[in-house]
Amino acid sequence: MLLERAFENTIVTGRATKPWPWADTWPVARIEVKRIHASAIVLSRSSGQALAFGPGHVERTPDTGQRGVAVYPAHRDTHFRFLKDLVTGDEIDVIRSDGRKFRYPVDGTSVVRFDASGINSLSDGYQLVLSTCWPFDALTQGPERYLVHATMISASR
């Protein structure tokens, strides 16, 4: 609720709004997948502290709607639990904190080592990668990551 309120306030005021006074992060986007009724507020950083509260935006990757690959990681057992239910063609909507909306259909998925993802944030095109630990039912963190790949098809206000 605090993240939702901070995100809505950011859209209305045009200023980054922290969800609580001592927060070291703030909402930058909302992810929605209507087919499976999933949504999550994306936070400005991908630090361990930020990921405790929601998906993060990996520093040095572009924002959604910008050329390159925007990367959002989150925990598999909480905020990105729904990734296991995504299928090719599902539409991921990303609403940025400036109110712009971008649609990304899922192109596919992959499982990679955390240190060998193959993601080039400066690549051509307008892409989105959602990342979480793999396998989904593991009890501890391992070296593999589950990636959802998507390419932007539309942008709107």
Regions flagged by a language model, labelled:
Residues 1-157:
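Solvent-exposed, non-transmembrane regions of membrane-associated and secreted proteins
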